[in-house]
Amino acid sequence: MKSFDLGEHLNDIYAAFPEANRQPVIGITANYTNGDAALRDKYYEQVARAGGTPVIIPPIADKNAIINTLEHIDGLLLTGGADINPLWAGEEPSPQLHSINATRDEAELLTARLAHNRQIPMLGICRGIQTIAVALGGKVCQDINSASPTLSDGTTVMSRIKHSQDADRQEPTHSVNIKPGTTLSKLYGERAFVNSFHHQAVAKTGPRFNVSATSPDGIIEAMESNEYKSIIGVQWHPEWLGDDGLPLFSWLVERANEFREAKELHERILTLDTHCDTPMFFPQGVRFDQRDPRVLYDLHKMTEGRHDAVIMAAYLPQPQLGEQFSQKVDIAGIIRHNPQLQGLSTQLSPTQYADLIFDKLEQIVDENSDYISIARTPADLYEDKRKNRKSIMFGIENGLALNHDLANVRHFAQRGVVYITLCHNGDNDICDSNRGSAMHNGVSEFGAKVIQKMNDEGIMVDLSHASEKSFYDALDISRTPIVCSHSNSRALCDVPRNLTDDQMRALAAKGGVAHTTFYHGFLRKDTSEATIMDVVSHLEHAIDIMGIDHVGVGTDFDGDGTVRGCADASELINFTLQLLRQRYSERDIAKIWGGNWLRVMAKVQSSKKQS
């Protein structure tokens, strides 16, 4: 018999510690009717059965309410309900359109898009799959009974099957064919029997999703992310199917639990990306405080990806013989978008150009000083994290910036530059490039002095882009460990830009690090698209050759580095998720995400000669 003694129930809770098991929090969108925000019990019961903690999300189209809600959930369940107003998809209403739910539309479309930005696992059910599609570039058929029944291969079938059953909600009434190799096929095999209560369906999934199941008459019954994200949408109602529906909820809870683990890990460790080229976009007037689609790094994306710090490089393209440096860069574009620079000459030296980039970065930081800071040392990075600020460090990509003047090494050290990539795509006065003509047969006499001066000033020597001979020369010349801020494995992708296994071993033997990059041409030599799994493969090969203490991540974002599954800074937590799936420990993930690099940085900076 049920007890009504509150103390008895509390005693059961207080009898052991912890009082409850940790569970991922699953936000569930509520329906809205006549002033009531409500939810059918089947949704939250299935979430609870799967091991999640369900919370109901009311349909409030307020950015503060939505974003703060998303910050506190680990997974999102978008529920069924009325039609979505077709105006949200840029369409006029069909005569067959049923009732809409305007209160839900804006709130849920915003929630879905913002959850996607934050990599939150999602399950969409019925209206929910349509919400995901509309929010992320897909299309919904306003009335499937008015459309010709066509299979995915273009074959027209004789008639539409019944998609709005009269049978009990718990009764499956038609089959769905599930595509092999999908997440759904791992849950249900190649065929499942489902219930059906809809007159609309996803017509086009959009570029971020693949169809994973169809009905016998060709209706899209399920879709899932093709970006290695934990997102599935189904047209049927698994919440009513008891044990048969439970696998989808278990999948959501498992993925939410994994995401919670990754979020908590990012709270505890420092994450540092050692190379991006976002300053290349300054001539286009990009804003770091806006979520700008033109760049892969900004404050929004860093926050969404729960990422702490990045080394932004002042990239200097290497002029060919007869070219002037000022012809290679859009100085006029930077001036155009920065009125305070009006009157500045467009005929800048490489040193002046690098200084201009760092001036602009300092301006960005000054304008957003509550949220971001310039860091010069590992201690600065940890202090910024403690104060909940993002960090930018300065790097130089191409020693051309020194303008053949050793005094500029100290100048850039004083500006806070933490590394200089000795060359880029072409030989310079310091060393030969892997895309050069062996002008010096390795490091030049001047280059040897540059390396020694960098050692004296506590600047890391970066050998990404250097020729193999330059690499070994620099390794012999430098008194401090060498880094490769964004370099991959030649054993997996045989291009001169990548490191051989012998180079990796030599680098590790001298205490250096090589950071895996996301540039597709250094991940795969064939024409197929590079993905986050290729990045993991290159990282793991580097670990096999050098050991866990000599690897890291240098994305090359905004320098053409991007892959499906980790396309910009908002998706960097997805890389952590992949490491967790590969069973890397927290300690090893911390090393990969910058711990190894910071060890080398500390050693290099501590070796600085006192003047």
Regions flagged by a language model, labelled:
Residues 118-120, 390, 459, 480, ...:
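A short helix->loop->beta-strand "cap" motif at the edges of active sites that frequently abuts
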Residues 208, 226-231, 384-389:
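Beta-strand-turn-beta hairpins that frame and shape the catalytic cleft
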Residues 261-439, 494-553, 557-611:
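N-terminal hydrophobic targeting/anchoring segments and the immediately downstream early-domain regions
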Residues 28, 77-78, 312, 422, ...:
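Redox-cofactor binding/interface segments in oxidoreductases and associated redox assembly factors
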Residues 400-403, 411-497:
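Divalent metal-binding pocket/active-site signature
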Residues 1-125, 134-135, 141, 145-187, ...:
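N-terminal beta1-alpha1 cap of cysteine-dependent amidohydrolase-like domains
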Residues 194-201, 233-238, 271-278, 466, ...:
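Histidine-centered catalytic micro-motifs
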